[in-house]
A protein has these predicted regions:
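Short beta-strand/loop motif that positions the catalytic acidic residue
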Residues: 267, 273-275
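Conserved alpha/beta-hydrolase "acid-adjacent" motif
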Residues: 280-286
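Catalytic histidine-centered segment of alpha/beta-hydrolase-like enzymes
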Residues: 281, 304-317
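Flexible "cap/lid" loop of the alpha/beta hydrolase fold
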Residues: 157-202
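Conserved HGGG/HGGXW glycine-rich cap/lid loop of the alpha/beta-hydrolase fold
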Residues: 53-105, 124
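Active-site loop/oxyanion-hole signature of alpha/beta-hydrolase fold enzymes
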Residues: 94-140, 144
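The conserved beta1-alpha1 loop
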Residues: 68-72, 138, 275
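Conserved alpha/beta-hydrolase catalytic His-Asp/Glu region
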Residues: 170-171, 197-265
């Protein structure tokens, strides 16, 4: 698993965004990975979703079983250090959300709900020539993962839920802060709406923030996030996250807040839930009770926050590989 502590520049990132947006979906796959000395297995390319929205997809091009990753809302590959390790043993395919990280906004701005995210996931699978595979989800991506598993079960062979619940996500926020359950969704929704109201002025500030070593340590020792194993890569993940306009992020979040709890009785594939004990965005209790509704599902709780794959990459990756072994044994 990746635990390098070298600084990684991101100048290559901004220089390629314009070219990515101008390429057609059928163009030659783009080689825009960081320099080889950075040690990251990462390549971006374009995929067109069912409604014509052009997505910025990515893969690590690693030999191994295929894993579709439904990432956290508005996040990026750099939040997954273990999956960017050339020796991780897992071939990942994923994409950046609509209007995020080089993916276009849809013509209809309301097409940003979980149903559309499932369409995007299917487009990525189809483009990669993958008939069915295991699926991992993080945070809001757990909603997408379970929605895909329920609506298109023939495409899913296993499920790995990290720091997320299968729907009704806003109702799971704030548990470690002792916010009563009845108040969690109203408070989370109010915060998301406030971000939308102050979006443009706030984005002008956050998009100019220098996320250097000191700022990075403040974030990773804030309690919201706990200390990480790869600080340079975490800083890159934070910098990239802050490039998304705040009002658009609010729009995406509010759309996902409408996603109801997914019924789990039909899930019949190997499933693992990995929760963070101190996660303020996805209550570990809710993840545990969700796991109890799926026969033979495994539940693991780690001493970490919402960002377990950055704080405990070795442990999370080992659990992922164990899930993939169960999928392989099932055939």
């Amino acid at each position: 698993m990746c635990s390098r502590d070298m600084d990684r520049g991101c100048a290559w990132e901004s220089s390629e965004v314009g070219r990515l947006r101008g390429m057609s979906a059928c163009a030659e796959p783009l080689s825009v990975a960081p320099a080889p000395e950075d040690g990251l297995a990462l390549r971006f390319y374009e995929v067109t979703s069912a409604d014509g929205t052009v997505l910025r997809a990515w893969t690590n091009d690693v030999e191994g079983p295929v894993l579709l990753l439904c990432n956290g809302l508005g996040t990026n590959p750099y939040a997954w250090p273990s999956l960017l390790d050339p020796d991780c043993g897992v071939r990942v395919v994923s994409w950046n959300h609509r209007g995020v990280g080089g993916s276009a906004r849809p013509t209809d701005p309301d097409r940003v709900g979980q149903e559309e995210f499932v369409e995007d996931a299917l487009a990525v699978l189809d483009d990669a020539g993958v008939v069915a595979c295991a699926v991992a989800g993080w945070s809001i991506g757990v909603n997408t993962m379970f929605e895909l598993a329920v609506t298109r079960p023939e495409r899913v062979t296993g499920l790995f839920a990290l720091a997320g619940v299968p729907g009704e996500t806003f109702g799971s926020m704030g548990a470690p802060l002792f916010i009563p359950r009845f108040a969690r969704k109203p408070i989370a929704t109010a915060v998301a709406r406030l971000l939308g109201l102050v979006g443009n002025p706030l984005h002008r500030v956050t998009s100019r923030l220098e996320i250097g070593p000191c700022a990075g340590r403040v974030v990773t020792h804030s309690g919201f996030m706990l200390p990480v194993t790869d600080e340079p890569l975490a800083r890159l993940a934070i910098r990239e996250f802050l490039t998304t306009p705040t009002d658009w992020y609010s729009h995406l979040a509010l759309a996902s807040s409408l996603h109801a709890r997914v019924p789990l009785h039909s899930i019949d594939v190997p499933t693992t839930f990995v929760a963070g004990r101190y996660d303020v965005l996805a209550a570990s209790h809710d993840m545990r009770t969700a796991s109890e509704r799926i026969p033979s599902a495994q539940y693991v709780e780690l001493p970490g926050s919402h960002f377990l794959q950055m704080e405990k990459p070795r442990e999370v990756h080992a659990l992922l590989l164990e899930l993939l072994d169960r999928v392989a044994l099932r055939g």
